[in-house]
Amino acid sequence: MSKKIYIGAMTGTSHDAIDISFLSIGTKIHLEYFHSIKFPKSLRLKVKKLIENNESSLSDLGTINKEIGFLFSKSINEAIGFSKIKKSSIECVAISGQTIRHEINKRFPFSMQIGDPNIVAKETGLLVVSDFRNMHIALGGEGAPLVPEFHNQLFYKARNPRIILNIGGISNYSFVKNRNDIWGTDVGPGNAILDAYCSDFLQIPFDKNGAIAAKGKVDHIELGRLLQNNFFKRKCPKSTGKELFNIKILSKKFLKKKAEDILCTLVEFSAKSIINSIHKNGHNNCDIVICGGGAHNKYLVKRISEMASNDIVLSSDLGHDVFAIESMAFAWMGYKRVSNEALIVQTSSKNVKGLLGSITKSKL
């Protein structure tokens, strides 16, 4: 009997690639195959404009929603071909969609993702699970982070509490202590502002290994101003997005400084946001496991390590690819949805359970 396979396809706040994980799930979670496909530059620029420009038209929104649906479909079909996994063994594909707006502090909070699941269902022939975040919000959560329960399943170790720190465009972490308890929160900017500065001012996608930042000096005045943001005063659990942490948050005077000093300060901002949250929440005496694209920014990891009182490892040191963790989480959430198993949703007052994700299929 062939293994049942669950696919997770993830594009994060950096909108630079679609990461695709193939999981088999039994007593353990096993990554059968991982594939990553870069966003076409033209589409990445369209998404960037849609996120940053409040005056984008409904026509633009509708068109890009379809384009990303086709990109997800093409990427998933390509990954299946490379994996040599039989399509008949695939139970579902869970897609994150591309987040273009995440606004929680409103009377009617919402999180908006694009990437039409109807197209993905039609083009792949698979059952699609999507739109996880809005049921999370409906149940009293913030729609992010979604991954704490998966982190618990993957990284739990008896008598050894862990912080699972995901550094994407936005940083979030899960506190893994008890098998049946979850705790997680967004903590602030990860790569979002760093990458935006590199793209807009240096015409490079990112500062590889943090090499430019490592040569600079911290502007403590700007850093102090950034750390006064009201987001950091909110109680956890909380969520945020590029609506808040983007290039516009930086002062005009600061943007006139040398590139290495700007990037050095932004690394410090990301690192301090993370460490301040860990300390504030009393999670000091446990290991930190880092995953996400920011794990490859050596200077950022170095600064986190120097500020922390915790031992630090990369998820890859534990056998889990730093780039694969989030798409693995979506595959696992897809598995839970098609199995009609509720997920734990963390709210400001208590944890509740609910079915996350909408199911779309193009045939019986």
From Swiss-Prot:
Please state the Enzyme Commission number of this protein: 2.7.1.170
Q: Where is the signal peptide?
A: none
Q: In which pathway does it act?
A: Amino-sugar metabolism; 1,6-anhydro-N-acetylmuramate degradation; Cell wall biogenesis; peptidoglycan recycling
Q: List, in alphabetical order, the GO biological process terms annotated in this UniProt record.
A: 1,6-anhydro-N-acetyl-beta-muramic acid catabolic process; amino sugar metabolic process; peptidoglycan turnover
Record's keyword terms, sorted: ATP-binding, Carbohydrate metabolism, Kinase, Nucleotide-binding, Transferase
- Where along the sequence do coiled-coil regions lie? none
Q: Could you state a single Gene Ontology molecular function term?
A: phosphotransferase activity, alcohol group as acceptor
| EC supergroup of this enzyme | transferase
Return the Pfam families for the record: AnmK
- Reactions accelerated catalytically: 1,6-anhydro-N-acetyl-beta-muramate + ATP + H2O = N-acetyl-D-muramate 6-phosphate + ADP + H(+)
Binding-site residues for ATP, renumbered to this chain: G12, T13, S14, H15, D16, A17, I18, D19
**PANTHER family referenced in this protein's UniProt entry, alphabetically:** ANHYDRO-N-ACETYLMURAMIC ACID KINASE
Q: Spell out the HAMAP family in the cross-references.
A: AnhMurNAc_kinase
- Give the protein family: Belongs to the anhydro-N-acetylmuramic acid kinase family.
Instruction: Give the function comment from the record.
Output: Catalyzes the specific phosphorylation of 1,6-anhydro-N-acetylmuramic acid (anhMurNAc) with the simultaneous cleavage of the 1,6-anhydro ring, generating MurNAc-6-P. Is required for the utilization of anhMurNAc either imported from the medium or derived from its own cell wall murein, and thus plays a role in cell wall recycling.
> Under what name is this protein listed?
Anhydro-N-acetylmuramic acid kinase
